[in-house]
Regions:
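Small-polar-interrupted transmembrane alpha-helices in polytopic inner-membrane proteins
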Residues: 67-80, 142-151
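Interfacial segments of alpha-helical transmembrane regions
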Residues: 1, 60-71, 128-140
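Alpha-helical transmembrane segments of multi-pass membrane proteins
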Residues: 2-20
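Hydrophobic residues within the alpha-helical transmembrane core of Major Facilitator Superfamily
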Residues: 9-11, 50, 77, 114, ...
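Membrane-interface interhelical loops and short amphipathic "cap" helices
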Residues: 17-32, 86-95, 157-166
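Interfacial helix-start motif at the membrane-water boundary
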Residues: 28-47
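Membrane-proximal helix-loop-helix units in multi-pass membrane proteins
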Residues: 78-128
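Terminal transmembrane helical module of multi-pass membrane proteins
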Residues: 118-194
């Protein structure tokens, strides 16, 4: 996951003049000539998340949580491999697949976090972080709602001159989801050290 964060920082610094962090989504780095780097970022995040999924499976947490984390990973892989449509361009199948992968990923992660922290036994490694994971899951879901509403607003009013800072909202969502992933991962690292 650290690789994904470093790549995201690199993209922001290198391409801030071409892709406004306030107005443009992370995926639009693809259209600024950074498709391979963006793809590696998504795939690195998926790989780190897959490691979390394996840790959860080893902790004997079955049910919907591994499935939802698998969907998060699959959505990230789609985002990394299938390019988004250029701003203002006609909608294509690949662009729709990219958008669908993003929605799938961003819907799945907060649900996984919420379900991971259901009350179970006292030896659950996530119990000490239950409140934090739940709060981050809610923050992720609320921020996703803002992102989707912003996207719908832009699509209905025209993307040429957006009045909604979709890029900023998506970056907040990305940061919240990274915090959620790290908070979900930390108990596994702590129990592995024991």
């Amino acid at each position: 996951m650290g690789v994904a964060v470093l790549i995201a920082i690199h993209l922001h610094i290198r391409l801030s003049a071409e892709v406004s962090p306030l107005w443009r989504t992370l995926s639009e780095y693809v259209n600024a000539g950074a498709a391979p780097i963006f793809g590696v970022m998504c795939l690195a995040l998926a790989a780190g998340s897959l490691a979390l999924l394996v840790g959860i499976a080893r902790a004997r947490r079955g049910g919907a949580v591994p499935v939802l984390l698998g969907l998060w990973c699959a959505g990230l892989v789609v985002c990394g491999l299938v390019p988004v449509d250029a701003d203002g361009a006609a909608r294509t199948l690949s662009g729709q697949l990219h958008n669908g992968g993003a929605v799938l990923a961003f819907l799945s992660l907060p649900l996984a976090g919420w379900l991971l922290t259901r009350r179970s036994d006292a030896h659950c490694p996530w119990e000490p972080r239950r409140t934090t994971i739940r709060r981050l899951s809610v923050a992720s879901a609320v921020t996703l709602g803002v992102v989707l509403a912003s996207f719908a607003w832009i699509m209905s009013t025209g993307p040429a001159d957006p009045v909604v800072t979709l890029g900023l909202f998506e970056r907040v969502l990305f940061a919240v989801d990274l915090a959620l992933l790290l908070t979900m991962t930390r108990p596994l690292l702590s129990s592995a050290r024991r």
